[in-house]
Amino acid sequence: MASLTLPALALALSNPGAVRLRAAAFRCWALRRRGWAAAGALASPNSVLSEHAFKRLQLGSDDEDGEGPYGSDADEGFEAGEGDNEELAIARLGLPDELVATLEKRGITHLFPIQRAVLIPALEGRDLIARAKTGTGKTLAFGIPMIKQLIEQDDGRITRRGRTPRVLVLAPTRELAKQVEKEIKESAPKLGTVCVYGGVSYNVQQNALSRGVDVVVGTPGRIIDLINGGSLQLGEVQYLVLDEADQMLAVGFEEDVETILQQLPAGRQSMLFSATMPSWVKKLSRRYLNNPLTIDLVGDQDEKLAEGIKLYAIPLTTTSKRTVLSDLITVYAKGGKTIVFTRTKKDADEVSLALTNSIASEALHGDISQHQRERTLNGFRQGKFTVLVATDVAARGLDIPNVDLIIHYELPNDPETFVHRSGRTGRAGKAGTAILMFTSSQKRTVKSLERDVGCNFEFISPPSIEEVLESSAEHVIATLRGVHPESTKYFLGAAEKLTEELGPHALASALAHLSGFSQPPSSRSLISHEQGWVTLQLTREQGFGRGFFSPRSVTGFLSDVCSAAADEVGKIYLTADENVQGAVFDLPEEIAKDLLTMELPPGNTLTKISKLPALQDDGPATDSYGRFSNDRGSRNNRRSRGGGASRGRGGWDTDGEDRFRRGGRSLRSDNDSWSDDDWSGGGRKSNRSSSFGSRSSSYSSRGSPSFGGRSSSFGGRESNRSFSGACFNCGESGHRATDCPNK
């Protein structure tokens, strides 16, 4: 490969202090001569050094006879028969003694793959693009050659006050910046290393720079602040490192990074480390790096998940995610550790706060202080709380054992991130579970994720109330079994008395209270997942009713049977069974109870369901509601134009992002008129004229429908509107089926 070119070997061999490094370099050259590195192994100056190619160019591959390929005379520092470990030993690479000593004191005695791949081209002065995953030793990969150069260049400069930095390391987050600073300080305590980032005192960092510094590590935003304030001078920077460059893009630092690069000396050496190569990173390398060598230890292989991870995917609306999240954790984590991944810091805070009412949780993101971060991680590891809500950036590099459940609250940016997130569970051969939340507009992305990762999701519905109660009880029982016997003896008297009084109900009451269900749980819609709503299924036998069965038929049925139900009906979806005419829809719990007790027209069956049947999905590819995307407020405060309570024409407010897709075939236009196709979306406000056999419908701002002109009320709502639709028994207009003279 290009990293092992003869100029690199010449540089290494010309350094009288690099005895061990000369041996390693000469060994690589000899391996090439023996044919181990064929045509692609040593290539053009900007060729790619891959993991596979590097394995063929190991710095110390044993021969079968136990003797190295050069014999015993290759170098005085080389001993025949020594294997890879000895050749890659830190002590044998010609590094300064003080650097070797500090590394060995930290237990670092050998190079990792990324470190051995970077070492020679970095010492050669090449610009580099290195692809390596998080946690593979990238910091020392660029740290070792830079520290070596700084120490060997020292002419008393290191102790000079007011010196400007020779090394600049840019990191996307303060967590990573502090980690890099720690690595460099521990490896080279003699060098002046300063870490700068936002959220802390500007003056403290300014004073540290004014005293003189060799290495500056920081986030782009604070670096620019210090440059603009005249506190940071970059005119003598010799080495630039962009660590996790792809994450710079993810957190919005691309413009800041380019601003900084434009102010650096042209003759600097630049090293860019990135797990992925988005277009911005490629553009950056073309513009600001000089004929860079690419070292790729990731490759183009598909990301794969560890075996033993069960994958689920659940379709939700944006607003229903938080409602369903706690139930998913209760049912699938079974009291174990859960990590919920969000994209933004704001989401992490809000999700954690929403969970706190039912499940102990903490947030982890870049705005949290280092002290709080460590406190949070220790508490999670020790089981003081069971749910950690984290952003991708804040969670990079974390090592937390025994995580039972991963929830992707938002879709990851790429397959690698999905694998990285999900890989937090199912470690060391243990079983684990990962659940992906997605909206209807993200279905294609989910399919692409399955293809790219090579996995298959099991698509699930939100847990039912019964499943949540059962799982909660099991968790409480497991907790009770862990109570120390010495503690229970103080409560035996009260327990016996209560058991005599209530029998098994005493224990049941205790389980309910400890599970957080002192009051009966309210119903929840299977469609919108909102509490206080019930999902019903209407089935009509063949031969009953007129025309095609459609959501319009459902609204007509409800208008004739119960005007209050028609006035409050939510979204309507047709079932997918071709042999049965059916639909599902939402109603407020109290209205649904009354409707289920009413007499229905012949051939119609109405039931409360606990699981959605297969539904027709022939709606538009988008789930935008057009003009209705922003005009729906809280459902409890909504009012129809006719004055009655309404669910916003069957739509659901989803924060303007991913709106729950209508079951119909067309979107509403930006006017107040409705077409027949609009009716197929279902859930329209029922202060309108409609019935089973009706051929026309019009939107009315009048009051709620009445039965044959009679005044009726439900829940305090008055209905005094005359009926102008058509009877579904005889098809004639002007009366309802309940008033039909032919019934």
Swiss-Prot record:
Segments carrying the region annotation (Disordered) are 60-79, 606-719
Q: Where in the cell is it found?
A: Plastid, Chloroplast stroma
The residue ranges flagged as biased composition, category Basic and acidic residues, are 657-671
**Residue range of the transit peptide?**
1-37
Question: According to the UniProt entry, which residue ranges have a biased composition of type Gly residues?
Answer: 642-653
Molecular function (GO) terms for this protein are: ATP binding; ATP hydrolysis activity; RNA binding; RNA helicase activity; zinc ion binding
Motif range (Q motif) = 88-116
Q: What is this protein called?
A: DEAD-box ATP-dependent RNA helicase 3B, chloroplastic
Q: Which organism is it from?
A: Zea mays (Maize)
